[in-house]
Amino acid sequence: MNQQPKYRIYATLLDAFGAYLNSDVIWDKYWGWSENPPHTPEEFHEQQFQELIDRINRKPFDSEAADKGTAFNEVIDCMVENRKSETVQVEKIYKVIREGACDETGKPLYYDEVQTNEVIGLKATYNNRVFTFPISLCREFSGYFKGALTQQRVEAIIPTAYGNVLVYGVIDELMPASVHDIKTTGSYTVGKFKDHHQHLVYPYALMK
C-alpha cells in the first residue's frame, strides 16, 4: 500500500482550521455579551480565515505570549535535561533584603539592599523580550517531568478519501505513560484547550 502523503498537516494548523469553522461560536463566547465588541462576527470570521491562511503559508508572526511560552518551555527542558540553553538566556534572580532605619513616625531614613544566596526566580531573555518565572514553579514543573523526553517530533499517516494525510507535531514532554503539552495562559478555565488537536494527534502518532 502506498503510504506517501498527499497532504502534510501539523496540529496547530488543525487548531486554526477549527477556529475558522467555529468563529461564530468563539465570537459569541468572548464578545456576545459586549455592547462594544472590537469587531463584528463577520470581521472576526475574516480574521480567523486570514490567520488560517497565514498558518498554511508559515507566515512569521510576532507574539509576546508565544515568546513567553517558548521561553518557559525551554527553561523547563533545560532543568529536566540539566543543560544550558542555546536559545534562551537564563539568569538567576536572588532574594534581596533591605536593612535600614526609620524615624519615630516610621518614615525610612535610609536603607541598604543586601543580596542573599536564595534563588527566588529565573529571568529568561528570548527574542529581545525578558520574562521572569518563580523558581518554585520551575522546580515543580521540572520535578514532575524528571526523566521525560523533551521536544519529540511525532508523525503518522491518516488514510482519507482525499488521499493520505501526514499529521505531525512536537511533544513538549513525553513520559512513559503520558503525553504533555505545556501551556502558558493569561487566564484559564476548565476545558479551555479541549478543542485543540495536540491531544488527538500525538497519541495517534505514537500508536502508529
Which ranges hold each PLM region?
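Metal-dependent nuclease catalytic cores that hydrolyze phosphodiester bonds in DNA/RNA
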Residues: 1-171
